[in-house]
């Protein structure tokens, strides 16, 4: 999401400038401001659980103002997960369709994981969502959504590797693809956890070239 500094949402009508900003702000812009602030709070080292009260305070608005844009905190997290899923699967799609002409499945797997690592490095707040830190004490379905996201990403890796293994004439391309995709996902998730646990000091892309070369064989 690359949260950037934005003018806070102003829920007060006490000044003319506040009223002017409020009048100009569109619902979509307000929702984005809220999500950017949420992500920025998640980026803080040793970040505590983000509450709607803390989020409202950061934005300089009332909690009621937040709930006019999102029905619940869970809905905000849903939006962050959607952003992350669209981004990761979108990046994977840019590598090319599995089995498409000119697409090297083995190389594609490495590129997809590399792009995911780059995304994580640029969006540390989203990494807290992916590793589950931001979902502690939240609705179980949110954790299930993240699990499904990883399943989708693994399926893309599996498809790429299966096509490559078939082209190489390997005896068990499907089984090989299952193992390789699982290993790549384990690596990716491990790197994300290390990024969080190090308070963003252990960068996801650090040493990734050598790691991926070893994993891809």
Model-found features: residue ranges?
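A short, glycine- and basic residue-enriched loop/turn
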Residues: 31, 47-49, 64, 73-74
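Amphipathic alpha-helical segments used for helix-helix packing
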Residues: 120-144, 193
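Short helix/strand-capping hinge loops at secondary-structure junctions
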Residues: 41-50, 70
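Short hydrophobic/aromatic patch on the recognition helix
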Residues: 60-70
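Short glycine/proline-centered loop/turn elements that form peptide/ligand docking sites
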Residues: 17-21, 49-51, 59, 73
């Amino acid at each position: 999401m690359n949260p950037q500094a934005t003018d806070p949402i102003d829920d007060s009508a006490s000044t003319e400038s506040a009223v002017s900003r409020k009048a100009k702000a569109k619902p979509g812009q307000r929702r984005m401001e809220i999500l950017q602030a949420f992500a920025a709070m998640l980026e803080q080292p040793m970040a505590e659980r983000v509450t709607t009260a803390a989020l409202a305070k950061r934005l300089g608005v009332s909690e009621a103002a937040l709930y006019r844009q999102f029905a619940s905190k869970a809905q905000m997290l849903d939006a962050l997960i959607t952003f992350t899923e669209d981004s990761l699967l979108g990046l994977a799609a840019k590598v090319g369709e599995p089995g498409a002409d000119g697409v090297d499945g083995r190389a594609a797997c490495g590129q997809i994981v590399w792009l995911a690592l780059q995304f994580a490095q640029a969006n540390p707040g989203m990494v807290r969502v992916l590793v589950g830190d931001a979902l502690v004490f939240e609705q179980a379905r949110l954790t299930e959504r993240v699990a499904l996201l990883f399943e989708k990403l693994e399926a893309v890796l599996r498809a790429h590797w299966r096509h490559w293994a078939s082209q190489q004439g390997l005896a068990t391309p499907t089984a090989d693809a299952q193992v390789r995709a699982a290993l790549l996902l384990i690596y990716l998730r491990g790197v994300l956890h290390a990024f969080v646990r190090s308070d963003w000091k252990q960068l996801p892309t650090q040493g990734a070239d050598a790691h991926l070369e070893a994993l891809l064989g």
